[in-house]
């Protein structure tokens, strides 16, 4: 799943552009662990740079295929991906396993690679910092940020808050929640920090 469900978060696509090999190795390890014979990389068609990067590294691998999906919300949700690739609708109570699928994102796949090759546990998180940031409006992509790192430190690393702001949303604009900047820290569930 390279379809960033939340529109402001870009770290999964950024990881794919930066290091497609770590992700492909993660796919291969996941296929071996689950016994899967085929893997599909679901990605929005608009992400041309990431698509080119992954296709370059897939040459010769017949069991991993790229599927370009529409740029619409909530295309990144696992049930929507399964429907887009296989045409199967899952009930709200059903999980991907009910369709004989496992859906993993780029960060999870890179963590699988690090666990297998380096014996590294998941002790950090990839984060997108975006919004009213002095470092510019473009998303700031931070990789392997230690869990427990204050969000305030990440915002400062990206240039700091640009003037007055409304709130800091941890996560994405649709599923994130506002948190107190003085107490917010990176958790295993953090995906982004949005300064509004």
Question: What are the language-model segments listed below?
Answer:
Residues 1-12:
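Gly-rich Lys/Arg/Thr-decorated short loops/hinges at beta-loop-alpha junctions or inter-strand turns
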Residues 11-15, 36:
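Conserved "landmark" site that anchors the functional core of diverse proteins
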Residues 16, 74-75, 175-177:
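Short, small-residue-enriched loops and turns at beta-alpha junctions
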Residues 17-34:
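Histidine-anchored nucleotide/phosphate-binding helix
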Residues 22-26, 53, 153:
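Long, highly charged amphipathic alpha-helices
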Residues 37-151, 157-164, 172:
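Hydrophobic alpha-helical positions that pack around
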Residues 125, 151, 158-196:
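Ferredoxin-type iron-sulfur electron-transfer modules and their immediate structural context
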């Amino acid at each position: 799943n390279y379809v960033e469900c939340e529109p402001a978060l870009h770290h999964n696509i950024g990881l794919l552009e930066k290091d497609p090999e770590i992700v492909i190795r993660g796919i291969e390890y996941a296929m071996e662990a689950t016994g899967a014979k085929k893997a599909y990389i679901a990605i929005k068609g608009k992400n041309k740079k990431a698509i080119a990067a992954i296709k370059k590294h897939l040459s010769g691998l017949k069991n991993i295929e790229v599927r370009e999906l529409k740029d619409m919300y909530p295309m990144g949700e696992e049930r929507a991906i399964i429907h887009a690739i296989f045409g199967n609708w899952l009930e709200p109570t059903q999980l991907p396993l009910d369709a004989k699928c496992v859906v993993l994102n780029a960060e999870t796949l890179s963590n699988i690679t690090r666990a297998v090759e380096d014996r590294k546990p998941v002790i950090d998180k990839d984060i997108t910092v975006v919004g009213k940031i002095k470092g510019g409006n473009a998303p700031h992509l931070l990789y392997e940020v230690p869990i427990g790192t204050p969000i305030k430190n990440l915002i400062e690393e990206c240039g700091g808050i640009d003037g007055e702001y409304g709130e800091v949303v941890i996560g994405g604009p649709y599923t994130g929640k506002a948190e107190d900047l003085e107490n917010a820290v990176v958790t295993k569930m953090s995906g982004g920090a949005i300064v509004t």
